[in-house]
Regions:
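Rhodanese-like catalytic fold shared by cysteine-dependent sulfurtransferases
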Residues: 1-35, 42-75, 81-147
Length: 149
């Protein structure tokens, strides 16, 4: 019999380590060396993220993990909005050979609601994104270059 989504999620969560948001915040505040990996999409990232997190959207994880996360023995904590994508991402990273991976549960939404530290990148308005769309596509300019202008 084929697995359901719920079966797959339960199986995945049984194969990974999970960390509560309170424990994660305590560890970060204590100065533990942790690489945070935010697997949310770009539009979610623009709304804010945990300071110093590496942005690696779930859809690009397997493709870009090697370049964005070169140390396979680093302590990684993966998070998303609610704890589902991060669970699947943590399992994928384990399958790719990363040795110390945890999934934050539940996720960024609760992290923010609890008042834990967040940061927000500069964000273009929809009007600016439309107006400067050609500039943003140019690798020589991109979002960072356009922000300077």
């Amino acid at each position: 019999m084929a697995k359901t989504y719920a079966d797959l999620l339960q199986e995945t969560k049984g194969q990974i380590k999970q960390v509560s948001l309170e424990d994660l915040n305590t560890r970060i505040q204590a100065g533990e060396k942790i690489t945070l990996v935010d697997v949310r999409e770009k539009d979610e990232w623009r709304q804010g993220y945990i300071p110093d997190a590496v942005h690696l959207p779930r859809g690009f994880l397997e493709m870009q993990a090697g370049s964005k996360l070169p140390d396979k023995n680093a302590k990684l904590v993966v998070y998303c909005a609610g704890g589902v994508r991060s669970a699947f991402a943590a399992k994928a990273l384990q399958d790719l050979g990363y040795t110390d991976v945890e999934s934050a549960n539940p996720g960024y939404g609760q992290w923010k609601d609890k008042g834990f530290p967040i940061t927000s990148p500069f964000a273009f308005t929809d009007e600016q994104l439309d107006r400067y769309s050609r500039h943003l596509l140019l690798p020589e300019v991109g979002e960072k270059g356009q922000q300077k202008l």
